[in-house]
């Protein structure tokens, strides 16, 4: 079989790795919806979903059946094409953002030299999905939620990008694998602590998670920009939000907590344990913090996060120049 060449085998293995990693991410995002409800029940001293399967373990299957068989309704007054396109963009952009995350020294979907810029580009693309969903629904609550989401996301993406520049300056590269290798001796969270704090805050805001979930506030906007969605279209938004949490958690691990580095255990296990810890922190934040007003969220971003990121960047640049002399 002369057509089986080493190059073809390498391509097939790369495709297999990509499929496995992306399937694991989607599965983790789906299971996180169940885990969140169980943990919220624990934090609030009540029962979570515990009726379907052992300990409620089949609740996810019940949710999937419900989602698959719900009517996929498109309002007559909506723009059908854009209304259908919005959840696809939201799901795909958040899933592709994980492609540049190195899970282990040998497992990464796309080892790009501009990995961080690719992540920021995908995060910016998700804003279009929210705007499309809000505008095409032709609903005042959807439009208000989309306007809130776009303003909030675009604002906090500024801090998200600036908080990473200190890490880039220290590693001397935008490549995620190079950044992880640069943390073999000391994790970036120590010299870049303020960068990590602002990245974590901006990451929660970009995911529209509590306490930055004003675009989806049920009490104010009746669930915001996806109020008109049902069935699998709503499912794409729903699972996409949890995929965003998985991606941000994985990026925290990769950029600030040494990625796969750790003693005794295999690299993939260390990466999974660290990522699971930050995913649990997202749930703990939701369970413990109140929701501020929208103007307070925006004011906090521009008056606290922006100065903090700029100070961190200036100090990092000064230290690098001092060490170079």
Swiss-Prot record:
Highest taxon above the source species: Bacteria
Entry's EC annotation: 7.1.1.-
Subunit structure: NDH-1 is composed of 13 different subunits. Subunits NuoA, H, J, K, L, M, N constitute the membrane sector of the complex.
InterPro entries on file: NADH_UbQ_OxRdtase_su1/FPO (IPR001694), NADH_UbQ_OxRdtase_su1_CS (IPR018086)
Family designation: Belongs to the complex I subunit 1 family.
Positions in coiled-coil regions: none
Transmembrane segments: 11-31, 50-69, 81-101, 114-134, 154-174, 186-206, 237-257, 265-285, 304-324
Stated name of the protein: NADH-quinone oxidoreductase subunit H
GO cellular component: plasma membrane
GO MF: NADH dehydrogenase activity; oxidoreductase activity, acting on NAD(P)H, quinone or similar compound as acceptor; quinone binding
Keyword Cell membrane listed: yes
Higher taxonomy: Bacteria, Pseudomonadati, Pseudomonadota, Gammaproteobacteria, Enterobacterales
Reaction(s) catalysed (UniProt annotation): a quinone + NADH + 5 H(+)(in) = a quinol + NAD(+) + 4 H(+)(out)
Mode of membrane association: Multi-pass membrane protein
Group of enzyme by EC: translocase
Subcellular location, record wording: Cell inner membrane
Keyword tags: Cell inner membrane, Cell membrane, Membrane, NAD, Quinone, Translocase, Transmembrane, Transmembrane helix, Ubiquinone
Main function: NDH-1 shuttles electrons from NADH, via FMN and iron-sulfur (Fe-S) centers, to quinones in the respiratory chain. The immediate electron acceptor for the enzyme in this species is believed to be ubiquinone. Couples the redox reaction to proton translocation (for every two electrons transferred, four hydrogen ions are translocated across the cytoplasmic membrane), and thus conserves the redox energy in a proton gradient. This subunit may bind ubiquinone.
Source species of the chain: Citrobacter koseri (strain ATCC BAA-895 / CDC 4225-83 / SGSC4696)
UniProt-listed GO biological process terms: aerobic respiration
